Regions:
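Helix-loop junctions and terminal segments of transmembrane helices
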Residues: 65-81, 263-305, 312, 359-365
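Signature of the first transmembrane helix
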Residues: 9-69, 105, 164, 222-248, ...
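Hydrophobic alpha-helical transmembrane segments
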Residues: 129, 153-203, 223, 378-382, ...
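Membrane-interface junctions at transmembrane-helix termini in multi-pass inner-membrane proteins
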Residues: 122, 132-155, 347-378
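Interfacial/gating helices of multi-pass transporter permease domains
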Residues: 35-61, 177-178, 216-227, 245-268, ...
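Transmembrane helical elements of multi-pass membrane transporters/channels
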Residues: 15-31, 159, 180-200, 214-287, ...
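Membrane-proximal transmembrane or re-entrant/amphipathic helices at the cytosolic face
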Residues: 2-4, 444-495
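Interhelical loop/hinge segments that connect adjacent transmembrane helices in multipass membrane
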Residues: 1-9, 177-181, 195-238, 284-299, ...
Length: 495
């Protein structure tokens, strides 16, 4: 019997943001705990094999969700207060997910089974085929549309803890990379799919999609087609560097992939935190844009970007000044050649932040997918071209420079064409520049004037600089800090 559709009680943006931030903090802390162990046990070469398999399958997983995620979030957000209408829309999207996941899975298996170059690590590639199913059928878009960030956050925390426990339990030496691949696949997408689907069946999202209500799903194809092109362009623009390192590196390609990925893990973990926090505004951004509430859009963007700059500025400076120490502590001496990559890639954090907020999400909210696709294709072509030449000249450092160059160009084009510079770059941002200069000065003094061991050097620098960073922002009345202080005051008053 079909469960009756019902309206979901939603939490405030502050509460959702807190849940999202907590989950991503766990997602950032877990790598600090487990990756030093993983990289020392596996080594750069074995770690690079798993990284390459994950990067390759991600393109087929992309096929299974081509444009569906963004379209589903947008359409389900608009229909979320109409449970019956939401069930119909979600059912159509579910049917499309099922079709695309099947096509993607079969295509990937054909390549793995029949291309000779895949033979040496075929068992590993076959295990990663499950990634496609987990990604395509995870249905996370329904939780986002219903603003169930509490449930999503708990799921992500459980998955990360499970990942940590499994790695420490089963990884023994460099030959354990196949087991590591199984752990990555299960905790990465399969666990998410099982959690989400079981939760939806139990009514956590108010409705249960069903093929019974999926008639007319062909109506979704046209708008999703352009979002699919957009997703392809974005993937080629942001993630093609690892494959190109594997194909064009003049040194040991598996080792080069392992070195490069070890360096970008930290910046990408921070990107994940920032983008999860920013995703809290996505449903409301779509609604405000659809209703032409420009003032509300500006307010959402400004508040969110302030939070993101508050976090990202000291993080970028830490990666830049202490890249070698962080790589040494994080991955071991076998990975020290990746330190310059960490420095360069940390600068990309700002590009990701700006492009996601004032670029990609704004274009999708305004239904400018075609224009955004063209921009991302330009970025993808530039990124591939830069990588082709830079990797041959400078190896993994060249790959990082190529990605940074492409991000800078795409950011400039996106914000200029839609006139969205004012969403992000307000006078308030000078406060972070001011505080960042103080942090940079303290980092330089600690790094070059004191001969501390690596770990102590980082701890002292972050501790002292963190205090000065907060003090400076307090005196200039930075909005995020003032909001946190006000919340704390109110909490103490209630007690």
């Amino acid at each position: 019997m079909q469960k009756q559709a019902k309206t979901v009680q939603r939490k405030s943006m502050t509460t959702n943001g807190a849940f999202a931030f907590a989950s991503k903090m766990v997602a950032m802390i877990v790598p600090f705990i487990v990756y030093p162990f993983i990289m020392r046990v596996l080594g750069a070469e074995s770690y690079g094999k798993v990284t390459y398999a994950e990067s390759l399958v991600s393109y087929f997983a992309l096929l299974s969700t081509l444009g569906i995620e963004s379209y589903a979030q947008r359409e389900c957000s608009v229909m979320r207060d109409n449970p019956d209408g939401l069930r119909k829309v979600a059912s159509r999207i579910f049917a499309l997910c099922l079709i695309m996941t099947t096509l993607s899975f079969v295509s990937y298996l054909a390549i793995v089974l029949f291309i000779p170059a895949m033979q040496s690590e075929r068992p590993l590639f076959l295990i990663f085929s499950l990634w496609i199913i987990g990604s395509g059928m995870s249905m996370g878009w329904l939780y986002t549309a219903q603003e169930r960030f509490d449930i999503s956050s708990v799921r992500e925390i459980v998955a990360k803890v499970l990942y940590l426990v499994l790695c420490f339990t089963f990884l023994k030496n460099s030959n354990s990379y196949f087991i590591f691949g199984i752990i990555v696949v299960f905790t990465g997408t399969v666990f998410t799919m099982l959690w989400n689907v079981s939760g939806i069946i139990r009514g956590q999202c108010g409705i249960v999609p069903s093929l019974k209500y999926s008639s007319g799903f062909s109506e979704c194809i046209k708008p999703i087609f352009f979002l699919a092109l957009l997703t392809i362009g974005s993937k080629l623009f942001t993630d093609f560097d690892i494959l190109m390192i594997k194909w064009f590196s003049s040194t040991d390609s598996d080792r080069a992939v392992g070195l490069y990925n070890s360096a970008i893990l930290l910046p990408r973990a921070l990107d994940g935190i920032l983008m999860t926090v920013s995703s809290v505004i996505t449903p409301r951004l779509f609604i405000a844009t659809r209703q032409r509430q420009e003032k509300e859009v500006c307010t959402l963007m400004n508040k969110t970007s302030n939070v993101l700059f508050f976090i990202s500025v000291p993080a970028i400076l830490t990666c830049w000044f202490f890249s070698e120490e962080m790589i040494g502590l994080f991955a071991g001496d076998d990975f020290l050649d990746a330190a310059p990559v960490l420095q360069i890639y940390s600068l990309i954090i700002i590009g990701v932040l700006v492009i996601t907020l004032a670029g990609t999400r704004t274009y999708i909210a305004r239904q400018k997918e075609r224009k955004l696709f063209c921009i991302l294709i330009v970025g993808a072509v530039l990124n591939i071209t830069f990588n082709y030449f830079y990797i041959r000249m400078w190896g993994i450092v060249g790959a990082a420079l190529a990605t940074l160059s492409a991000y800078a160009i795409v950011m400039t084009i996106e914000l200029t064409l839609e006139h969205t510079w004012h969403y992000i770059f307000t006078l308030d941002k000078l406060k972070y520049v001011m505080a960042g200069c103080v942090v940079a000065g303290i980092f330089a003094i600690v790094k070059y004037c004191f001969n501390f061991p690596s770990f102590l050097r980082i701890v002292v620098a972050i501790g002292v600089a963190g205090i000065f960073y907060v003090v400076v922002l307090y005196f200039v009345k930075e909005s995020t800090l003032m909001h946190v202080i006000e919340k704390m005051k109110n909490a103490f008053k209630m007690k």
